[in-house]
Amino acid sequence: MSEAGGRGCGSPVPQRARWRLVAATAAFCLVSATSVWTAGAEPMSREEKQKLGNQVLEMFDHAYGNYMEHAYPADELMPLTCRGRVRGQEPSRGDVDDALGKFSLTLIDSLDTLVVLNKTKEFEDAVRKVLRDVNLDNDVVVSVFETNIRVLGGLLGGHSLAIMLKEKGEYMQWYNDELLQMAKQLGYKLLPAFNTTSGLPYPRINLKFGIRKPEARTGTETDTCTACAGTLILEFAALSRFTGATIFEEYARKALDFLWEKRQRSSNLVGVTINIHTGDWVRKDSGVGAGIDSYYEYLLKAYVLLGDDSFLERFNTHYDAIMRYISQPPLLLDVHIHKPMLNARTWMDALLAFFPGLQVLKGDIRPAIETHEMLYQVIKKHNFLPEAFTTDFRVHWAQHPLRPEFAESTYFLYKATGDPYYLEVGKTLIENLNKYARVPCGFAAMKDVRTGSHEDRMDSFFLAEMFKYLYLLFADKEDIIFDIEDYIFTTEAHLLPLWLSTTNQSISKKNTTSEYTELDDSNFDWTCPNTQILFPNDPLYAQSIREPLKNVVDKSCPRGIIRVEESFRSGAKPPLRARDFMATNPEHLEILKKMGVSLIHLKDGRVQLVQHAIQAASSIDAEDGLRFMQEMIELSSQQQKEQQLPPRAVQIVSHPFFGRVVLTAGPAQFGLDLSKHKETRGFVASSKPSNGCSELTNPEAVMGKIALIQRGQCMFAEKARNIQNAGAIGGIVIDDNEGSSSDTAPLFQMAGDGKDTDDIKIPMLFLFSKEGSIILDAIREYEEVEVLLSDKAKDRDPEMENEEQPSSENDSQNQSGEQISSSSQEVDLVDQESSEENSLNSHPESLSLADMDNAASISPSEQTSNPTENHETTNLNGECTDLDNQLQEQSETEEDSNPNVSWGKKVQPIDSILADWNEDIEAFEMMEKDEL
């Protein structure tokens, strides 16, 4: 399911076009297997590689020979009973049988494999059999998706290599595009499926009667999967380029355009199934496995084959979302498209094994190595990759139909790195197939990988893909009779020539008005990767990535619980306590993840904590996670009577600022209430010690001034008491997390220490690192800096008053917490301090992480002149919050002389906002029914 290469110099390419093809596809060349390899595995000798390659040839002969002897012209071989599987003559297997159309499926699917394996005589015989025996006008209902990738793709792959062999002058001299004519006939038979208002095809079609006729027995379906509708462009475009009939590519493009338009705009993810008439998402979970996988694959490969930049832009947008939400290295977990920080399930399916290969094509090697290694560890535990397995690597669905996706990714990782480790992985696959799946009449699928029981099936993709990738893994360039890098692999591993990008380009590229997400794609200036850049002077690079994952499966197994105290004595860090947790601390988030606790930023600006014990790194971590959640509930109970406070302002009033710089500050739940008392004005001075956690050693420096204190090491209230005792008239706590900012993080408020704080009489405010650095820089530049602590900006000079109207008092809305679920426990959470007490304000079962909405700056003129504009704010992860967040009162956070700076994101059209809002409402309603 991934790209083979792309030097663009295939034999069928005219010389005048060759340079254009090279220029168009050079970025997608996979480096040769002579690349730098990691020292973790000994290089495999040419003799051993040749031996393994010959073993693959023998295995193919065993499978293909038994199909031809015992099953042909049936679609597939039943290897346990040594007979063919004919539609209607065997008990129905449901949707699986929709791939069977009484068109000798396995033979067509195997055509180009014969050429790759250098079985040219057998290929010529097979083509003659297809032309003589195969009938495409059968009264049978088939899957549009499966028929496209297996039959249409097989015919086109066979045609591509037939004309290559004919040009070489030895074989196929009689061939006159007969396979192409069959492909065109099949293409026209599939076109009626696109007769929908959306342009998305029906999932099934009758080869003889089409759609919606009484005798068709199909056409009443309303839903299709995203991959089913989005995995057509390669085959349909190739058919158009080969024949000049543009209608096929046009229909496939229209389907892709519709899917792109229907993506969830805030997450840029797509669901699993969609209504083909309305475009509504039916299943709103999203991942890279079954139901979606090849949609992403075909966006990138369509760019390679067709050279249309829009496909690459779409892929990059989706890929950014995948890596942001779905990728949890080394895992790839499905999420909800409207709540992408919330996992939709706790298991993964085997089809995602193709994704590391696609990442190689993208040029993102590190996560490809990580996920591939995780999958390999699962295989070593179960001999094969189960159809689905849980996040702790237990079997969820025990079947294994001899899927080739893992072999595919193994091949492309070897091509990209030249690491002999992947040859050893391939050797393991060969050994397992022969040891556990081989039967006298072929290779049988595994009914249960735990018991080794078989199922009487050998799917056509086993011959189309598995043996192709395994042979290419061990073959040297001279072992293949053509240059494999002149072709692109379809999702069924059929070969389409890259020179099609310069042929019959009459189809105009649709000028879509859709906006693409601006992405920092600097990490992928090359695609595929140059190992000399990726592994500079470090032959152990790939091994260093794999090493931590070597025992990932075994470590997930249940084991006796070690006493926590003993683990502390052995040098392990104590578990994260709820009172120390800070939502903006990456280290804390990593600890939560290890404990199986997910921090989810919801669209309404709230934060949700969810614990899944099975996702914890170990049983001890799961226990720590449960303790953490219980502590959160206790903190909520302790702080329930505390009030939520609006943001405050720190205004620099000394020369040369004169009130022009106003910084958004977080309030304290103790000390002088600036909304009820006069503002505090004074010069600032740094405290010693900088964290203010002990008696100050420089009381003379802070006497009568506003003390600057570093966050951390003790409670906020303790800091306040220490600077108050030193004579300070106020305090500003500056965040110790470098880079934190009020325009990218929610408002933070400082809580007390659970004791009586009436003794604290001075005002205390909190500044994030970015805002705090402005004051520190001003001190370095001007030495004496005077600030005003207030509930809102005041005393601006006349020039500033002319530029900007006085800001209205900020209200703090929607600062109630979010539910946190741990087993049957639910609590509401608010922003908490690292190493200080949490701000907890709500009912007894609620806990606030103070105002999870950002303090954005919108000038009064903007608020009045554009009442319908959506000024999006940003949560901790940079994720856009939803429309209801925008209704929150926004505080001014100016840091320059322009008073009208808005920290909001770019404006969306109101129709788009309302459409996404309606989708979110539907998703929230549906979420109540989800099993999480």
UniProtKB/Swiss-Prot annotation:
Record keywords: Metal-binding included? yes
> Which sites carry carbohydrate?
N118, N195, N504, N511, N810, N814, N900
Q: Pinpoint the PA domain residues.
A: 674-779
Needs which cofactor?
Ca(2+)
The UniProt entry's GO biological process terms, in alphabetical order, are: carbohydrate metabolic process; endoplasmic reticulum mannose trimming; endoplasmic reticulum unfolded protein response; ERAD pathway; mannoprotein catabolic process; protein glycosylation; ubiquitin-dependent glycoprotein ERAD pathway
Q: Which Pfam families match?
A: Glyco_hydro_47, PA
Q: Where is this region: Disordered?
A: 790-908
Q: Please tell me where this protein is predominantly located.
A: endoplasmic reticulum
Q: Which residues form the signal peptide?
A: 1-41
Q: Kindly state the positions of the motif Prevents secretion from ER in this protein.
A: 929-932
Tell me the route in metabolism or biology where this protein functions. Answer: Protein modification; protein glycosylation
Q: What positions constitute the catalytic site? A: E146, D293, E387, E405
The entry's linked illness reads: Congenital disorder of glycosylation 2V: A form of congenital disorder of glycosylation, a genetically heterogeneous group of multisystem disorders caused by a defect in glycoprotein biosynthesis and characterized by under-glycosylated serum glycoproteins. Congenital disorders of glycosylation result in a wide variety of clinical features, such as defects in the nervous system development, psychomotor retardation, dysmorphic features, hypotonia, coagulation disorders, and immunodeficiency.
Q: What is known of its domains?
A: Contains a protease-associated domain (PA) of unknown function.
Q: Which family does it belong to?
A: Belongs to the glycosyl hydrolase 47 family.
Protein name (record): ER degradation-enhancing alpha-mannosidase-like protein 3
